[in-house]
Amino acid sequence: ISLGLVGSEMCIRDRYNYSRESNPTRAYLEEIISNLEGAVDTVACSSGMAAISLVLELFSSGDHLICSNDLYGGSTRLFTLQQNKGLKFSYVDTTNLKSFKQYIRPQTKAVFIETPSNPTMQISDLKKISALCQAHKLLLIVDNTFLSPYFQNPLLLGADIVIHSATKFLSGHNDIIAGSISTGDHKLAKRIREVSKTVGNSLSPLDCYLLIRGIKTLAIRQKSQQENALKISNWLNRHPRVSKVYYPGLIEHPGYEIK
């Protein structure tokens, strides 16, 4: 049996017509993360790096991004790769707003920050940086992997996009690779989802299910991990063979007072 459809009829689809674009398990996971981050929409991705790659697709050749000078190595490698395609990146100390401002140019479109940063745990003041970004009409993109929504909600502090390597704290069970992108802006959410449908880096239904399972214990895991990390950091801080401890929970850490 054959069926002829005109173009407009072909565009009428069920929400779950094509699993790569969406499926019930993935939609439920995205709703959960959106609720945790205070977002209007979330896109679940196949990894944290896939999430960052997807966000970079929002920009065009010649666009300039300002980035933390202390970043996960995989992110800097990806940015180096993107330079071959025409994107420009400047790495700055995002804990110093005075030096930060001088890197803004007419081609600057966004700021990409990890806070705490990987690996030296630098803390950037998201409220102040978001105010600066808004004044210059720049997107603020925050990798929230290290703190998770349990400890920090960048969207509520003025960020436009929040990224997670959900492989880590969100999942917590060391048995999946996953990522996510959340935003509080409806127009931006539509752009991100359209890119996601096109590039096809979505998370599989099984991995979505496993991530949902992991998020159920996020609060109790994060509370215990923070308590243990503080005890270990204090012990190391007193150890005669340890010269420096990078942990923002220590009172002498330069970012300790930032909330």
Residue ranges of each PLM-predicted region?
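Single conserved hydrophobic/aromatic residue that forms the stacking wall/gate
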Residues: 1-7, 11-12
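Conserved PLP-enzyme active-site core in the AAT-like
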Residues: 42-241, 246, 251-252, 257
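Short, conserved beta-strand segments within well-ordered enzyme catalytic domains
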Residues: 17-19, 43-44
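A structural motif shared across PLP-dependent enzymes of the aminotransferase-like
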Residues: 8-9, 18-30
